[in-house]
Amino acid sequence: GPQQQHRL
């Protein structure tokens, strides 16, 4: 499935 990146 699609991957999500989290940036702060």
Curated annotation (Swiss-Prot):
UniProt tissue specificity? Expressed in seeds but not in fruit pulp.
UniProt KW keywords: Allergen
Superkingdom of source: Eukaryota
Query: Could you tell me what this protein is called?
Result: Allergen Act d 13
Could you tell me which species this protein originates from? Actinidia deliciosa (Kiwi)
